[in-house]
Amino acid sequence: MKWSEICVHTTQLAVEAVSNLLHEVGAQGVVIEDVEDFDRMMAEDHFGEIWDVSDRETYPTSGVHVKAYVPASGDFQDLLSNLKKEIERLRTMLDIGSGDVTVAEIDEEDWAHSWKQYYKPVKISQQLTIVPLWEEYTPQPEENVILLDPGMAFGTGTHPTTMLCIQAIENYIREGDHVIDVGTGSGVLSIAAAKLGAASVKALDLDSVAVESARQNVETNGVGELVQVDTGDLLKGVEGEYDLVVANILADVILLFIEDAYARTKSGGRFITSGIIGEKRAEVTNALVAAGFEIEETRVMEDWVAIIAKKG
Ligand SMILES: C[S@@+](CC[C@H](N)C(=O)[O-])C[C@H]1O[C@@H](n2cnc3c(N)ncnc32)[C@H](O)[C@@H]1O
């Protein structure tokens, strides 16, 4: 079977929005080529083990390539013109850079290779290493491994917003904590919380593809007894209180449910929130404080911010 590779050249700021557009028009997986990510991974003691320096030549010298793979079937031209229209609409809201779209035809075998070749085992925090399900990997004795196949859900674990969240969870979680993960995607944050000592984790997502992916990943990692994955719209209908409320969703979505997050956080508990682009930091911080939280810490990676807010 022939597949088409669609490549959009964009900015780091617009990666998630462009990835979403590609998913919406029917892409079967997205590959992100960002030279800054590549250089960071190379610098983090995996040099030569996992990343091959010659791969760097395939990355754009500036900006980011978001690549997606779709069957080269009859309605491909409609899909492409829809995508281009949506990219132009996005341009009115966000700095998307050139937004240039290029197309290449590839064989299925190459597609499988292209989709997975950049997704390798990555140590994402002191204790946790994410390993793609299809990779053979022998962990070090102190390494705690999360096996992941995100499929079409967001959450390879290696996006800065996810890494910030997992590092904060590792820092603040206490043995026996009860955790809720809003917008679980592949389930990566919930699995991390379970592996780091949570007594229970409730994982919610609006998207049925994410719910299915999270359920599979939870089972693969043997934490099905601890993590309950359900469909849910933010914290609507959720009752009870949690030691940790975690959410890696865009700032504009976080702003919608800060008050609900406060209500669902135990006294002395924390709301760990990520997915906040730098320019939205003040707005989210102010809204957290207005809801009654104290800002305990703000972590930054590239253009992204995670805020750890405490309920006194
Ligand atoms: C940026 S991804 C984060 C995935 C994963 N938690 C991680 O950290 O990598 C955001 C997720 O939030 C979900 N989402 C968006 N709006 C939502 C809503 N209103 N209620 C629940 N989930 C939502 C999306 O479907 C997506 O899976």
Swiss-Prot record:
Cellular compartment(s): Cytoplasm
Gene from which the chain derives: prmA
GO molecular function term, any single one: protein-lysine N-methyltransferase activity
Name of the protein described by the UniProt record: Ribosomal protein L11 methyltransferase
HAMAP family with a match to the protein in the record: Methyltr_PrmA
EC number: 2.1.1.-
Pfam families: PrmA
Binding residues annotated for S-adenosyl-L-methionine, in chain numbering: T162, G183, D205, N248
Any single GO CC term annotated in Swiss-Prot or TrEMBL for this entry: cytoplasm
Cited function: Methylates ribosomal protein L11.
Family classification: Belongs to the methyltransferase superfamily. PrmA family.
Reactions that this protein is recorded to catalyse: L-lysyl-[protein] + 3 S-adenosyl-L-methionine = N(6),N(6),N(6)-trimethyl-L-lysyl-[protein] + 3 S-adenosyl-L-homocysteine + 3 H(+)
Swiss-Prot/TrEMBL GO biological process terms: methylation
EC class of the enzyme, as a word: transferase
Keyword Methyltransferase: yes
Keywords linked to the UniProt accession: Cytoplasm, Methyltransferase, S-adenosyl-L-methionine, Transferase
Gene3D superfamilies reported in the protein's UniProt record: Vaccinia Virus protein VP39
